[in-house]
């Protein structure tokens, strides 16, 4: 920062927020309510007029603040922060009919489960073109269009596929046995892994295939630990700080599932495909969620942090030669019950409609 500016304007912080303070005039130039501020540049259009510019980020927006150094009046220019918010205009392949139908289904799903915000995305599985990406939120009881948040949900949805990939890399068969015990695994004094049925005594001894198809967290943990760096995989798969969105979920799932576009070994592809397809067949925990008249590969997930619940679906179809990849994410305030069944009917409406298109 220029010495003159540095002597006069300082960036102050309070409770994790930032603002600009004028030491010369003992004046708070801005409120201390921004997420990030940094000095940008100094501009002197004429001898008697000087401006100091700062870059800032606040919520979903970013911009520049220009301060008139004579009287501290401000000029601001702001826009959606491209790191946090996507734009439909960036995707010339958007299909207006698919987008409209996707919005309808997302709106109905949010109404059915009291969603506060949600996203839906449809990808062309053969070209990876984005055909639809939309977002809605509930504002005072009305469902309205919302910004396309790039950080909406956890990567935890992918856990069964990460586990299947780890088994292939470690040359461990899906038919090998894994002991999930009584549904609770104590790693240390502060970390416990619980299966969803731990109150009923857990799954006990399973094959890895059964463990992954039943989404046993203990089984998936042991699958990842078959690799020397398995704990890193576990932290990545369960890390709440590594967030994604409906468009990325659909795109990445299509990438790892589509044989022609993945530069990994046949064993790794085979494991991922097997788990993704068998999730919706007899023996898979989601077999009752399968759509009619189309073979689906994918997964549902419900994440609950005690405050909010995130319902997520990602998948592609038809499984033998995918035409579309779809993802839907809906968030709501924590309450019980919470099950994938609460969104699967609406997801299947979209899948079955697309399959006939």
Where do the language-model regions lie?
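Residue-level detector of conserved, function-critical positions
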Residues: 1-89
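Extracytoplasmic/periplasmic proteins that interact with beta-lactams or build/remodel peptidoglycan
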Residues: 66, 70-119, 310-313, 319-320, ...
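Short pre-catalytic segments that frame enzyme active sites
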Residues: 90-158, 165, 169-171, 188-191
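Residue-level preference for non-acidic, small/hydrophobic
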Residues: 102, 109, 120, 128, ...
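Short glycine/serine- and small hydrophobic-enriched flexible loop segments
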Residues: 107-108, 164-171, 222-225, 251-258, ...
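Conserved catalytic neighborhood of penicillin-recognizing serine enzymes
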Residues: 147, 172-229
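A penicillin-recognizing enzyme superfamily signal
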Residues: 210, 232-356
